[in-house]
Every structure is written in structure tokens, then in C-alpha cells.
């Protein structure tokens, strides 16, 4: 295995840990700073929103930078942002620091993905991308639960120091292990957004956005959605997040094989339908330990299993624009995540927290509708010779 890809994956692990660990410490953050849980939940919103908005902008403005310089700068900003979070005296400082950390992630993640793909021969590109992205999915299995456990032993600030430490280790690894890499061809922001003119691509990106807006509206407030099982125990919540992360990693790997065998369309449909039904049942499944674990497993399998066929579909539609489309898909995912914090907060104000899954299920159902519309446009284009997706 190429060591350079593992180094890039280490940075993705840091970024992923920061993305997913906050949900498990929201009650502590809210209590410590004397604010409501919905307000504390905007930590997730601002981190994800800054990533989504700044990712294409940074890529356009810093496209001429050497890759290692851009990767290191992103990780340094990421570490500084998380250190400020750990030291923040008020919710205002906390929220501002999440924007800084999001900027660092926006500089690092798309660059790492594109760099990983450029380091290998075209026939090995998918495998290289899988290794780099594995850092992100493994963060759900290891980083987030470990961070939650640290918060249980110490406090939420210790968790943010942990994230900063992981980012520092990743930066050191990039500095010493990654050789200088020439800058990739730069692209303007308009060029990056050009594929959005294709309805097939736009609808596929909307599928990603809506699906993860639904999934993360529950994840952001997972501590209160499953509190009838965890009873406020950080260790029990960490256990649930560990199960979710392991299921996510398995779902990601299995979805790759299934997509190669059956095509992206069937896997996208199956993942969305199962996920929507699973969320719709959480008002009842989250009341008992066994059904909660089952719901968490299904959620992890389908939620992360959706990413692979979505990426496969986009690359098949426009192979020459693959790096740009991966960046746009990541942006769509993070817009969904940032929207989830707001939608989840609104949901907590409207109805019982244990019914938040009903709203999540509705959003995933809308994502399924977008996927069906994408299918129609793909089939129509195939008739006149454009690439089709099975």
C-alpha cells in the first residue's frame, strides 16, 4: 500500500473526527457555557457550512499552490481553530472557532482527495480514493467514540484538545512523509461550478444534500434522541457511536463491491429507502436497547453506503470532471450537514426529541425523489449517446 495515501488518510481522520465528535459532547458544551442544546448544535452547522462554502472558493484561489503547502496550511488552520474552541470562554468564541476549523478542513479535504487520485495510475484511482476516504469513515468508528469517552472522563474541552492533537500528528506526517507535489491545474470558481448546468449532476448532488440533511439532523442531536437508552451516560453514548462508526466503515466497503456488481442506481435506491424507513421508526426503536442498536447499525450501513454509489454515478456521468465533481459532492454533503443542525434545532422546538427521526425520514424520502428524477434524465441522455448509469 502506498504510504503517501496513508498519510493523506491520517489528515482525513482528523477532519472526520472533528466533524463527528461534536454531536456526542453537545450536552456538556451547553451546560458548561449556559446555553441551550440547539444553540450549541450550531457548532456542527457552522463547521459544515464554512467547509461547504469555502471549499470551491479555496480551490479556485489557491489552485496554483504546491499541494503539500496547501495540505499543511489547511491542517495548521484546522489545529488552530480547534485549539481556540478548547480555550473559548463563551459560545460566541466557540462558534467563531468552528468557522476557522471549517476553513482548514476546506483547504485540506478536497486537496487530499484530488492529490490521492493523482498519485497513482488511472486504473488504480478508485482504490486510491477509497484509501484516502477510509480515513474519514474510520473517524466515525474510532475518533468520534474516543472523543466522547475523553469528554466523559474529563470534559468537552479535553475532546477538542484531542482533535487538535490528531491534526498536529497528521500535519507532522504530511511534512515528513509526503514529498513535494506540483500544483494541480487551477480552475476558477465558475469552471468548478460549470457541471451544475447538467440536470443529471445537479439532481445527484441534491440527492446527497437532502439525504445527509436528514441523516445528520438526527446525528447532531443523537445524545437526546437516544437518551432513553443511554440515560445521559457518556460511555453508553460512545458505545452507540462506536457501533455506528463500525457499521459505517463496513457499509462503505460493502457498497463499493455491490456497486461494481449491480450498478449505482440499485444501491442508491436501496440505501435511501431503507434509511428513510429506519429513521421513521426511531420514535419507537430508540426506546429500547436492542432496537436502538439495530437502528444505529442500519443507519451506519446505509448512510455511508450511499456515498460510494453517488460518487460512482457522478464519475460515470463526467469522467473528465471527476475531481471537480468529487469536490461538489463533498460540498453538497456538508451543506446537508450544516442544514441538519438548523433543521434539527427547529425540530426540537416543534416536537418531542425522540420524534426527530420522522423529519429525517421525510428528508431522505425527498432525496429518493431526487434520485428518481436523476434516473429519468440519465435514461433520456443515454438515448442520445451520453453515458448511462445502471
Language-model regions, residue ranges each:
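Cytoplasmic helix-loop-helix junction between adjacent transmembrane helices
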Residues: 97-136
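Helix-loop-helix hairpin linking two adjacent transmembrane segments in secondary transporters
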Residues: 91-93, 122-176
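Helix-breaking motifs and short loop linkers at transmembrane-helix boundaries and internal kinks
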Residues: 34, 66, 87-93, 231, ...
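Paired small-residue
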Residues: 81, 92-100, 290-298
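Structural signature of the two symmetry-related core transmembrane helices
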Residues: 70-83, 266-280, 361
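Conserved MFS/SLC helix-loop-helix module at the cytosolic interface between two early adjacent transmembrane helices
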Residues: 53-92
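C-terminal transmembrane helical hairpin of 12-TM major facilitator-type secondary transporters
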Residues: 265-310
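Helix-to-loop junctions at the C-terminal end of transmembrane segments
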Residues: 55-66, 251-263, 348
Amino acid at each position: 500500500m502506498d504510504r503517501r495515501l496513508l498519510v493523506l488518510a491520517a489528515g482525513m481522520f482528523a477532519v472526520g473526527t472533528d466533524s463527528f465528535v461534536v454531536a456526542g459532547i453537545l450536552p456538556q458544551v451547553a451546560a458548561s457555557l449556559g446555553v441551550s442544546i440547539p444553540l450549541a448544535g450550531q457548532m456542527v452547522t457552522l463547521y459544515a457550512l464554512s467547509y461547504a462554502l469555502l471549499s470551491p472558493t479555496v480551490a479556485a484561489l489557491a489552485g496554483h499552490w504546491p499541494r503539500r503547502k496547501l495540505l499543511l496550511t489547511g491542517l495548521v488552520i484546522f489545529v488552530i481553530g480547534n485549539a481556540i474552541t478548547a480555550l473559548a470562554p463563551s459560545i460566541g468564541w466557540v462558534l467563531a472557532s468552528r468557522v476557522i476549523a471549517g476553513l482548514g478542513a476546506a483547504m485540506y479535504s478536497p486537496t487530499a482527495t484530488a492529490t490521492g487520485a493523482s498519485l497513482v495510475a488511472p486504473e488504480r484511482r478508485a482504490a486510491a480514493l477509497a484509501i484516502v476516504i477510509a480515513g474519514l469513515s474510520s473517524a466515525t468508528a474510532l475518533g468520534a467514540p474516543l472523543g466522547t469517552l475523553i469528554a466523559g472522563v474529563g470534559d468537552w474541552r479535553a475532546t477538542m484538545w484531542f482533535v487538535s492533537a490528531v491534526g498536529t500528528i497528521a500535519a507532522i506526517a504530511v511534512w515528513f512523509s509526503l514529498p513535494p507535489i506540483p500544483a494541480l491545474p487551477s480552475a476558477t470558481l465558475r469552471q468548478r461550478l460549470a457541471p451544475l448546468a447538467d440536470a443529471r449532476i445537479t439532481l445527484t448532488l441534491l440527492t446527497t444534500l437532502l439525504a445527509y440533511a436528514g441523516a445528520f439532523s438526527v446525528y447532531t442531536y443523537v445524545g437526546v434522541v437516544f437518551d432513553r437508552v443511554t440515560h445521559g451516560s457518556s460511555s453508553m453514548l460512545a458505545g452507540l457511536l462506536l457501533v455506528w462508526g463500525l457499521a459505517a466503515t463496513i457499509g462503505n466497503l460493502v457498497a463499493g463491491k455491490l456497486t461494481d456488481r449491480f450498478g449505482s442506481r440499485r444501491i442508491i435506491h436501496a440505501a435511501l429507502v431503507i434509511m428513510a424507513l429506519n429513521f421513521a421508526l426511531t420514535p419507537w426503536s430508540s426506546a429500547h436497547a436492542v432496537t436502538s442498536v439495530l437502528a444505529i447499525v442500519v443507519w451506519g450501513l446505509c448512510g455511508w453506503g450511499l456515498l460510494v454509489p453517488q460518487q460512482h454515478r457522478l464519475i460515470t456521468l463526467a469522467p473528465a470532471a471527476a475531481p471537480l465533481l468529487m469536490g461538489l459532492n463533498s460540498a453538497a454533503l456538508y451543506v446537508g450537514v450544516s442544514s441538519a443542525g438548523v433543521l434539527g434545532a427547529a425540530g426540537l422546538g416543534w416536537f418531542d426529541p425522540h420524534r426527530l427521526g420522522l423529519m429525517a425520514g421525510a428528508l431522505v424520502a425527498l432525496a429518493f425523489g431526487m434520485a428518481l428524477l436523476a434516473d429519468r434524465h440519465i435514461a433520456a441522455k443515454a438515448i442520445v449517446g451520453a453515458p448511462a448509469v445502471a
